[in-house]
Each structure stands twice: as structure tokens, then as C-alpha cells.
């Protein structure tokens, strides 16, 4: 009997300790960080409407806060503006002259590739820049990229104008050099002809034989001319 009691006692103690061990394991697992499970990324639940399928004929009529604060709308507007002819862009831009940032930005997008002058482009950028504080934060990065593109266009126009002036100056200098070259060429030809004439004269002089002291035209002393019959001969004494 005692032997049986000794065998059952440790088993009862072991069974009684199982709940404690289970609780201890739960506490340890609770405090242990979950290394194996990947951390879930917190993505804001916010979806933007995609205007890629919107017809270009309808894109300009869309308005409202949800549309005007959507950068995808402005990207689609830029894409549609690139497909217009310059005259069409100017005609469309005349409809947005109320002075709001939305319509001013639309004007800028439409006129950017309408073959405007650098002065018109500079004035256009200045008007939009004056309203830049009203542009929503969602659209501001896109607007800044557009503004940087316009600044590059103005810089390119200045470089072209500077190159044109240099080319005109170079052309004028080239014309002057051509005229000087023509004058020098004429002088060189005249000098060459003079040298050729002098060379011919020297050649002619060198081919002549040198003459002696006797001249056939001069009569010899012994050959005096006979007195003329008309000469009067004095009488001898």
C-alpha cells in the first residue's frame, strides 16, 4: 500500500503542475516578439480615379474638388493638350480666363506647346506662379515639374537667340573678310601682271645682240661727200 502511494504521489504532483507550465508558456510566448511573422505595411486606404480612359474632348469639362486635386487628371490633361494643334490650343485656352488657379493652370498646359513667344511663356508662368500657394499639395509636385519644364524652354529660347546674334555677327565678319579677300585678290592679280610684263621686257632685252662702236649711219672720215654742183668754188689766184 505504501509502495503504491509513493508511486501515485509524484504523478499527482506532475499533473497538478501542468496548468502552471501552460500559463508560463503563454506568458513567454506573449512577451516574445514575433520575428517570423512579417510586419504588415500600413498603406493608407485612399484610391485615385484614373482618367486614362477619359476622352480628350471631355477632359476639359470635368471639374470639382475630387477632380482638380487628382494629379492623374492633370497628367491626362497634359497628354490631351499635346495632341492639339496650336490654333486649337489657343482657342481652348480662351475659355479659362477667370483667374482661378485651376483655369490658369489649364491655360498654361494648353499654351505650353502652342508655339508661343518667350515673352508670352514668361508671362504665363508668372501668372500661375502668383497662384501657386492655392495649388493643393497633391498637385504641387506635378506643377513644379511643369514649371521646371517651362523654365528650360525659356532658357533654350535665350540660347537660340544668343546663337542667332552670334551667327549674324559672324556672317557680317565673314562678309567683310570676303570683301577684303576680293580686294587683295585683285591687287595680287595686278601685281602679277606687272611682274609678267617686266619679265617679258627683260627677256626681250636679253635676246638682243650688243652693237659695236661702228654705226652704219655715221659716215667714215675718208668718205667725204662730193661737193654739190650748186656749191660755188672760189677762183684760184
Curated annotation (Swiss-Prot):
Q: How does it sit in the membrane?
A: Lipid-anchor
Q: Which PROSITE patterns match?
A: PROKAR_LIPOPROTEIN
Entry's localization field: Cell outer membrane
One Pfam family assigned to this protein is Lipoprotein_20
Q: Where is the lipid attached (S-diacylglycerol cysteine)?
A: 26
Primary localization: membrane
Q: What happens when the gene is disrupted?
A: Mutants are unable to form pedestals.
- Lipidated positions (N-palmitoyl cysteine) are 26
Q: Which domain of life is it from?
A: Bacteria
Show the segment(s) annotated as Disordered.
201-237
Q: Which cysteines are joined by disulfide bonds?
A: none
Transmembrane portions of the chain: none
Write out the GO cellular component annotations: cell outer membrane
- Signal sequence extent: 1-25
Q: Does the keyword Chaperone apply?
A: no
Q: Which UniProt keywords apply?
A: Cell outer membrane, Lipoprotein, Membrane, Palmitate, Signal
Function summary: Involved in the regulation of virulence and metabolism in EHEC. Required for pedestal formation in host epithelial cells during infection. Necessary for translocation of effector molecules into host epithelial cells, but is not involved in structural assembly of the type III secretion system (T3SS).
Identify this protein by name: Quorum-sensing regulator protein G
Report the source organism.
Escherichia coli O157:H7
Encoding gene, per UniProt annotation: qseG
